[in-house]
Every structure is written in C-alpha cells, then in structure tokens.
UniProtKB/Swiss-Prot annotation:
It catalyses: Dipeptidase E catalyzes the hydrolysis of dipeptides Asp-|-Xaa. It does not act on peptides with N-terminal Glu, Asn or Gln, nor does it cleave isoaspartyl peptides. CDD domains: GAT1_Peptidase_E. GO terms for cellular component: cytoplasm. The gene is pepE. The keyword Membrane does not apply. One of its GO terms (biological process) is proteolysis. This is Peptidase E. Disulfide bonds: none annotated. It comes from Shigella flexneri. It holds the Pfam family Peptidase_S51. It is found in: Cytoplasm. Hydrolyzes dipeptides containing N-terminal aspartate residues. May play a role in allowing the cell to use peptide aspartate to spare carbon otherwise required for the synthesis of the aspartate family of amino acids. Keywords: Cytoplasm, Dipeptidase, Hydrolase, Protease, Serine protease.
Length: 229
C-alpha cells in the first residue's frame, strides 16, 4: 500500500499544504486522477474545500473530484488512482463515510494500489479506529472503527504543552487514559509538521520534530525522522 499520513495541513509562514507538496509529488508515481473526501469540513462547504484542494494540487498535474458531487461515489472511488481525505472533524468524517458506504471501497482501492493521502482527520481515518482524534464528538459516527490501512493509532497535532495556568490534562495524560481501557494499542503522538509514509511495505517517519510512541505500562519512546515502524 501507498499512504501519506500528515499530522496537519498548514505550518507557520507557509501556505496551506505547502510543506506537503514535495511529499505528494514523490509518491504520485504517475497517478493523476484523485477523489477528494471533504466530509470532515464543517465550517466550510464541501464545494469550497474541494476547490481549494484542487487548486493546490493542480500544479502537480492532479485532477481532483469531490466525492460528494458525483452520482455514484462508490464507482468513483473504485476507479480512482488517488484518494485524498481532508482534515476537520473526524467524527463528522467517519459518520458521512459510513452512511454513504465508502469505508470498504476506500480500503479496497488502496489495497489494490491507489495512493491514500490524509491530513489530520484524514490521517486518523486511516487508523484502525478514530479513538485518538483530538476532535469534539459533534455527531455520532455509529462506532469508532475506521479504515485500518495503517495498523497503529495516530494522534495528530500532538503536543504536550499547556497554556500557562491551564489545569486541564496534557495530551499524554489523555493518551494514557485510552491505554488503560485499551492496553493493546500502540499510539503515535505525531506533532505538527511531521508525517508517516507507507511505501513498498515500509512505514517511515518524516518531519523535523520529535514524535513519541506510547504503549501501556511503558515510558513514551521518542522517535526522529527516518524511523521505520
């Protein structure tokens, strides 16, 4: 399988998806026809989200079709060379994909060789479940099971920093809560600016920041770019 799982879409001082474009270009390998899954977008319309994505990827020669705009979305996915899943609210994303019967077709086409690109919520959707999202559960997705294209859980936008005076839990504390009730999980705290690529049977960490792996009963393990999972 070919996957590009990004923690986030925007970095300080850079345009939207700018940091991801070289990574996308490297993994295209001749693929040009993409379907875009905009359902995580809540405060922007799906048309606007699709148009923004299409404009950014046009210089790479990628043609983007919003899956919400086609008559037969399952057929569109089955014929896609690239599946792009945008960030936003992960619960809304999973709910829409489940209700429209898109989870199995996405999994199948990626396993057959389509490239999967997802940022933030889109990276969460590639995991076995969405239980490591940071998002508010604004809708009920009727279960947390997701695509299971990547075997570990990703927590995008990972940071352990707290604002001065803030008394809420750190991100690691939230992750540790999940590991109490699901100790079988391995969770990757993927900070902004980092990504995971899956290509030719290998999953590789990229990006300038330290990533952390969390397991039940163990200290967090720091990982740097180039680490293979």
């Amino acid at each position: 399988m070919e996957l590009l799982l990004l923690s986030n879409s925007t970095l300080p001082g850079k345009a939207w998806l700018e940091h991801a474009l070289p990574l996308i270009a490297e993994q295209l390998q001749g693929r040009r026809s993409a379907v875009f899954i905009p359902f995580a977008g809540v405060t922007q319309t799906w048309d606007d989200y699709t148009e923004k994505t299409a404009a950014v990827l046009a210089p790479l020669g990628v043609s983007v079709t919003g899956i919400h705009s086609v008559v037969d979305p399952v057929a569109a996915i089955e014929n896609a060379e690239i599946v792009i899943v945008g960030g936003g609210n992960t619960f809304q994303l999973l709910k829409q994909c489940r209700e429209r019967g898109l989870l199995a077709p996405i999994t199948d086409v990626v396993k057959r060789g389509a490239l999967y690109i997802g940022w933030s919520a889109g990276a969460n959707l590639a995991c076995p479940t969405i239980r490591t999202t940071n998002d508010m559960p604004i809708v009920d997705p009727q279960g947390f099971d997701a695509l299971n294209l990547f075997p570990l859980q990703i927590n995008p936008h990972f940071t352990n920093a707290l604002p001065e005076g803030h008394k809420g839990e750190t991100r690691e504390q939230r992750i540790r809560e999940l590991l109490v009730v699901a100790p079988e999980l391995t969770i990757i705290g993927l900070p902004e600016g980092n990504w995971i690529t899956v290509s030719k049977g290998h999953a590789t960490l990229g990006g300038p920041n330290t990533t952390y792996v969390f397991k039940a009963g163990e200290e967090a393990v720091p990982l740097e770019a180039g680490h293979r999972f």
